[in-house]
Amino acid sequence: MSTDPSYPGVSVFMTVRNEERHLRTCVRQILAQEYAGDLELVVAVGPSTDATARIARELAAERPQVTVVDNPSGLTPNGLNAAIAAAKHDLLVRADGHALFPPGYVAEVVRVLDATGAANVGGRMVPEGTNAFARAVAKAMSSPFGIGGAAFHTGGGAGPQPTVYLGAFRRDAIEKVGGYDEYFTRAQDWELNHRIRESGEVVWFEPGLAVVYHPRDTLKAFARQQFHTGGWRRKVMSKHPESVSLRYLAPPLVVLASVLGVLVGLVGVFTWPWLMLGLAVPLVYLLGVLVIGWFEGCDLDPPARRRLPLVMAVMHLSWGAGFLRNA
């Protein structure tokens, strides 16, 4: 396909591991982007227990726009840095094996980068579940009560934000701050955007940029993800204490208050009965989750709606426990 040299070249970059379920669809949607300039895709492949590496090689053999590089550690920031190093263009658009670009996404991020002069431009994560549990997760991830008030989750007006989903970067802005910090195996996007903003650059949220994301679809996988995310958020806050906010402290406070309430209540069973009032703390929290989850899920199908309170509780408690353990 011929390209228009008046348009800047774009390198889409991503890192994958155990993504055989989504990789082909993700890559095909990226390559189907209607962008007039040169477009390449660089995929860093980590050690996988499924057919991810074979599928990536097949895609590279079929499509000359696809380049595959190794990510021996399998860790996300290492893979992203390896893909960026192999990319040939100065506009870098991040992709993800669980995410799907809508038509025109690349052209729009290039336009917004040029119009705003920002170092990074991104939009909303639009989670879509493939089963009842994942649909409940998708709802929780879009709810201020579920995951907090970040614009890329819940929406908002265009303008500077602390972080955005995925993002489209100017290479010079990433190189100026040293790329992704490979210490942060989770939360590396937020941490990178923090350093970009600290360097005097702008991270721009554009609500019209919406990327579909497939969330975890089992309780175990979702709880594990939230536990590790909470732990790594604490590590980010330890390195960047100025980033501390009540939104990040709320889940660990809920965990602490609930555990303390249960312990005090159990002491009351054997000593002073009035201490049993401590049990009211976790009970009030669970009642609140049930009520809010039920009303927030009014637009879900019945199986997903029934699961939403559980998903919200797992999200809060797993995230908070991970934060406290500093996983």
Put a short name on every predicted segment.
Residues 8-11, 40, 191:
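Cell-envelope/extracellular polymer assembly enzymes that use nucleotide-activated donors
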Residues 28-38:
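Short, acidic, metal-binding catalytic loop of nucleotide-sugar glycosyltransferases
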Residues 45-54, 73, 96-102:
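A conserved acidic beta->alpha catalytic loop
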Residues 70-87, 108, 164:
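Glycine-rich, basic loop-to-helix element that forms the pyrophosphate-binding segment
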Residues 92:
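Short aromatic/hydrophobic "clamp" motif used to bind/position activated sugar donors
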Residues 100-135, 214:
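Conserved donor NDP-sugar-binding/catalytic core segment of glycosyltransferases
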Residues 181-244:
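Catalytic donor/gating beta->alpha subdomain of glycosyltransferases that bind UDP-sugars
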Residues 254-327:
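Membrane-embedded multi-pass helical conduit in multi-pass membrane proteins
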